[in-house]
Amino acid sequence: MIKGIGLDMIDLDRVKQAVEKNPRFIERILTEKETKQYEKYEGSRKIEFLAGRFAAKEAYAKANGTGFGKHLSFTDVEILQVEDGRPHVTMPIKQGETVFVSITHTARSAAAQVIIEQ
């Protein structure tokens, strides 16, 4: 049974400006493991990765029904790549839940959809 569906989209320029204004923005969004993946990329691919994770985490919070705030922060949600390159939510997974995530990019934006099944 589907517990929730979340969708989010963000402009790449908005993410780039946030990083330029405050480099600690990256620490607010990415976990340590995600940051290691982020650091492997160069140039515009870094912004695409960060924007994709931002959108995916927003989509997760929407699918979860909580949004971000007192009970959930960006670094509480971790999305890593499995060996075949697909994104996979590694935390927080509640017992009995399956989380599906899809991330896409264009030249100007990143979008993500999350479905949580229970």
Swiss-Prot record:
State the needed cofactors, names only. Answer: Mg(2+)
The subcellular location is: Cytoplasm
- What's one GO-annotated cellular component? cytoplasm
Its EC number(s): 2.7.8.7
Q: Where does Mg(2+) bind?
A: D8, E58
UniProt key word Transferase = yes
The UniProt record lists the keyword Metal-binding? yes
Pfam families with a match to the protein in the record = ACPS
- One Gene Ontology MF term: holo-[acyl-carrier-protein] synthase activity
**Catalytically driven reaction(s):** apo-[ACP] + CoA = holo-[ACP] + adenosine 3',5'-bisphosphate + H(+)
Q: What class of enzyme is it?
A: transferase
Its main localization is cytoplasm
Arranged from A to Z, the UniProt key words for this protein are:
Cytoplasm, Fatty acid biosynthesis, Fatty acid metabolism, Lipid biosynthesis, Lipid metabolism, Magnesium, Metal-binding, Transferase
BP term (GO), one: fatty acid biosynthetic process
Function of the protein: Transfers the 4'-phosphopantetheine moiety from coenzyme A to a Ser of acyl-carrier-protein.
Entry's family note: Belongs to the P-Pant transferase superfamily. AcpS family.
What's the protein here called? Holo-[acyl-carrier-protein] synthase
Gene name for this UniProt entry: acpS
